[in-house]
């Protein structure tokens, strides 16, 4: 089981925003490779996870409810499905607070599997060829 730590620094959120992105009906999932820095160490068996909901979603009580629901769903999904040494950011959407919780969990699981698949595949054919050459 993977240890899930909290992403807190703004520069980490900005770095992850430049990485991969998968959209689902109730959330957006972003991911990027973890980088060590003076304010944090990368655990061998862990990943970092951050949450954000913008003011476009609604007033504070709606944004807070959306973040609570994202955290609860992530507690179910991430320990078994996330990859080590990857930083993830969950972004709440306008319907995150209202969507059925089981659907939110299933959409999060699908998005996480999709982004992990993209991470594990080589970026282009030249990378795949280099990987084959190294294997031989």
Language model: regions and residue ranges:
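Positively charged, solvent-exposed patches that mediate nucleic-acid binding
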Residues: 1-136
């Amino acid at each position: 089981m993977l240890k899930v730590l909290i992403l807190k620094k703004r520069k980490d959120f900005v770095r992850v925003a430049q990485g991969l992105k998968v959209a689902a009906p109730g959330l957006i999932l972003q991911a990027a490779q973890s980088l060590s820095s003076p304010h944090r160490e990368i655990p061998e068996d862990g990943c970092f996870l951050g949450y954000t909901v913008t003011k476009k979603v609604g007033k504070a009580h709606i944004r807070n409810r959306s973040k609570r629901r994202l955290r609860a769903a992530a507690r179910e999904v991430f320990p078994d499905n996330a990859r080590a040494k990857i930083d993830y950011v969950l972004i709440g959407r306008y319907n995150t607070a209202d969507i059925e919780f089981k659907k939110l969990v299933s959409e999060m699981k699908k998005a996480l599997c999709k982004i992990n698949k993209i991470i594990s595949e080589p970026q282009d054919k030249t990378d795949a060829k280099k990987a084959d050459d190294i294997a031989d």
